[in-house]
Amino acid sequence: MAQRYDELPHYGGMDGVGVPASMYGDPHAPRPIPPVHHLNHGPPLHATQHYGAHAPHPNVMPASMGSAVNDALKRDKDAIYGHPLFPLLALVFEKCELATCTPREPGVAGGDVCSSDSFNEDIAVFAKQVRAEKPLFSSNPELDNLMIQAIQVLRFHLLELEKVHELCDNFCHRYISCLKGKMPIDLVIDERDGSSKSDHEELSGSSTNLADHNPSSWRDHDDATSTHSAGTPGPSSGGHASQSGDNSSEQGDGLDNSVASPGTGDDDDPDKDKKRQKKRGIFPKVATNIMRAWLFQHLTHPYPSEEQKKQLAQDTGLTILQVNNWFINARRRIVQPMIDQSNRAGFLLDPSVSQGAAYSPEGQPMGSFVLDGQQHMGIRPAGLQSMPGDYVSQGGPMGMSMAQPSYTPPQMTPHPTQLRHGPPMHSYLPSHPHHPAMMMHGGPPTHPGMTMSAQSPTMLNSVDPNVGGQVMDIHAQ
């Protein structure tokens, strides 16, 4: 190794250095030199004797003095280049340059050329070779001390560069691992985006189902309205009220069916499943279906307990946090719109209401709802149009028979209502035996064309005697 450095031409002297003079200047030009006292050859220079090429008058220094300075510099350089430790100094300097400008790749062969461990090996090899050939030190102790200190400084510099590389590698590794593993807040954001998209698609599908259901119900209500108008000129407000009630109830049923059956409709298309999975990008469809099924089974209380969350997390393969966030979004985006829709329709989200009462041909339960605080207009369902009898609602002294078909009673202003059940419809049938307390008299029912007066209260008075008003019978034959 020492022979390798001895053969280098740029270490033989300053004349052999291949450095352009335009970059660093002429190496033989006079330069300002600090006082050098550690060298035992050459006279000491005073601080006032600074000469350089940049001096305004380069010819001030005598020629004999300049030649003496150049000779002293040349002798010092030759002494340094010829020192036994100079090849080791050049080696550590090259390693520092490589550690500074070369990218480190630990997995690549030759990546540890500029490490401090390799330099320790180089020192051992160099010491063996030099001791076999010549001594490590020269006859000048000051020069030996200078070389040793220079090697130590470069060695410290190499160690510091190695520490910097280790810190850089550690930072890069941690940063890349942080990018690869998503943070929990990112999962929450993606889950919200995916659930909002899926809920939007489900609501759009349910609106399509409602559009398919509504035309038939509209036709039925139109037929019922025409039947009313053919017999008697019933008020339009009552017809629209019943029509809106039927439409809203069907809308509620359609919404329940469309949302509660995730396996129908567009979900059967595998291409659309893939597109939707890409849009959501986080939860598999099987996991979503499991949680949605649990939600619709517990609509009355859609709040899973901690044990149920753990069970759902095991069934779906998700974390408890993901399950919890999904149910938070589902209660806001699925359950709440259903409650709002049923409230707008005047239909309470109670299974006993929809299952306990039978439905009439008009779509309303036979246990008909009575509106508190609203004038009852005495409109009979379509199935009871041919039934004899004269029903006067909320009887008062102004009850009268509508014999003229051209008369249209004034439209009553509806009040905020609350639904409650009235008596069964069979209690209004003439052939059904009535209790005297219900009829308020023991005599037979009045003639169909007869006007009900104050001393003969009507059957509907038993429904709510507190509600009174001037109401007229519009179903007189």
From Swiss-Prot:
Q: What InterPro entries does this protein map onto? A: HD, Homeodomain-like_sf, KN_HD, PKNOX/Meis_N, TALE_homeobox
Q: Where is the composition biased (Polar residues)?
A: 204-217, 239-251
Q: Segment Interaction with DNA: which positions?
A: 299-333
**Gene Ontology CC terms:** chromatin; nucleus; perinuclear region of cytoplasm
Protein localization: Nucleus; Cytoplasm, Perinuclear region
Q: Where is the MEIS N-terminal domain?
A: 110-193
Extract the SUPFAM superfamilies matched here: Homeodomain-like
Q: State the UniProt keywords alphabetically.
A: Activator, Cytoplasm, Developmental protein, Disease variant, DNA-binding, Homeobox, Intellectual disability, Nucleus, Transcription, Transcription regulation
* Superkingdom per UniProt: Eukaryota
Q: Region Required for interaction with PBX1: what ranges? A: 71-191
Outcome of mutating R332M, per the record?
Impairs DNA binding and PBX1-dependent transcriptional activation. No effect on interaction with PBX1
Q: A GO biological process this protein is involved in? A: positive regulation of transcription by RNA polymerase II
Region Transcriptional activation domain, residue ranges: 340-477
Query: Where along the sequence lies the DNA-binding region?
Result: 276-338
Expressing tissues: Expressed in various tissues. Expressed at high level in the lymphoid organs of hematopoietic tissues. Also expressed in some regions of the brain, such as the putamen.
Q: PANTHER family under this entry?
A: HOMEOBOX PROTEIN TRANSCRIPTION FACTORS
Functional summary from the UniProt entry: Involved in transcriptional regulation. Binds to HOX or PBX proteins to form dimers, or to a DNA-bound dimer of PBX and HOX proteins and thought to have a role in stabilization of the homeoprotein-DNA complex. Isoform 3 is required for the activity of a PDX1:PBX1b:MEIS2b complex in pancreatic acinar cells involved in the transcriptional activation of the ELA1 enhancer; the complex binds to the enhancer B element and cooperates with the transcription factor 1 complex (PTF1) bound to the enhancer A element; MEIS2 is not involved in complex DNA-binding.
Instruction: Cite the record's note on assembly.
Output: Monomer and homodimer. Heterodimer with HOXB13. Isoform 2 interacts with TLX1. Isoform 3 interacts with HOXA13 and PBX1 isoform PBX1b. Isoform 4 interacts with SP1, SP3 and KLF4. Isoform 4 and isoform 5 interact with PBX1 isoform PBX1a; the interaction partially relieves MEIS2 autoinhibition. Isoform 3 also known as MEIS2b is part of a PDX1:PBX1b:Meis2B complex; Meis2B is recruited by PBX1b and can be replaced by isoform 4 in a small fraction of complexes. Can form trimeric complexes including HOXB8 and PBX2 or PBX3.
Disorder this protein is connected to according to its UniProt record = Cleft palate, cardiac defects, and impaired intellectual development: An autosomal dominant disease characterized by multiple congenital malformations, mild-to-severe intellectual disability with poor speech, and delayed psychomotor development. Congenital malformations include heart defects, cleft lip/palate, distally-placed thumbs and toes, and cutaneous syndactyly between the second and third toes.
Family note: Belongs to the TALE/MEIS homeobox family.
Q: What name appears for this protein in its UniProt entry?
A: Homeobox protein Meis2
Write down the species: Homo sapiens
Its taxonomic path starts at: Eukaryota, Metazoa, Chordata, Craniata, Vertebrata
What gene is this protein a product of? MEIS2
